[in-house]
Amino acid sequence: KKLIDFIKRKKDLIFYLILAFIIFIGTYIRTLNISKLKDITTGTWTLGPDLDPFLFLRWAEYIVKNGSLMAHDAMRNVPLGFDTAGEMKLLSYMIAWFHNILSTLSLSDSVTYSAILFPVAMFAFTALAFFLFAKKVFYKENKLIRNSIALIATLLFVLVPSLLPRTIAGIPEKESVAFFFMFMAFYFFLEAFTSEKFKFSLIYGVLAGIMTGLMALVWGGMIFVFFTISSAVLISFILEKIKV
């Protein structure tokens, strides 16, 4: 009886503990391959079998060493080189910032190792963002139903096989960061859409715009945000859910 009373009083705490466990399971699965990412010939770390991450790593190493990215990359599109202003550079900067944090805490001795851990760390934040988004979708339900649905959805999200290759350790791809910004954009949009006070709608709308802009600095797939939000607003207008 005491246990039941405790659970009733601490329902929110129980939900967040379950969420933490779900995220832990997801991150654990995504770090099982780390021991395989060490080059047995040199004893140094290397990224997984993907092409783009090596470019992002090289740029991140340059940023860590020099403070900012070069304007012209002579190693890309040889012999003409490549104007880095034409590429989405935020990912490499985020890897560099992540390395600076880990190295300060003595948790990483190389940019490569930090890049290996980076997609897993971003996945944890993405899972949290997805939980908030899923919970907000069912904002009209009571708290128990909202949290339960969001937890089940998050569990399926962290275990879905198609997401694993883009969020696993050693593959610092654009999607590992972009998904976080995407779900936060959706979450803030729903907050703005459902808020009863104009000032809060404005604040959340601005935050949704910022998240969308940050996603655009990482991944061209930000167009999904435009399509999703515009379609949702159009359908709501047709169903007379929006007062004009």
What are these regions (language model features)?
Residues 9-12, 72-75, 133, 169-172:
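Interfacial helix-loop-helix linkers and transmembrane-helix boundary segments
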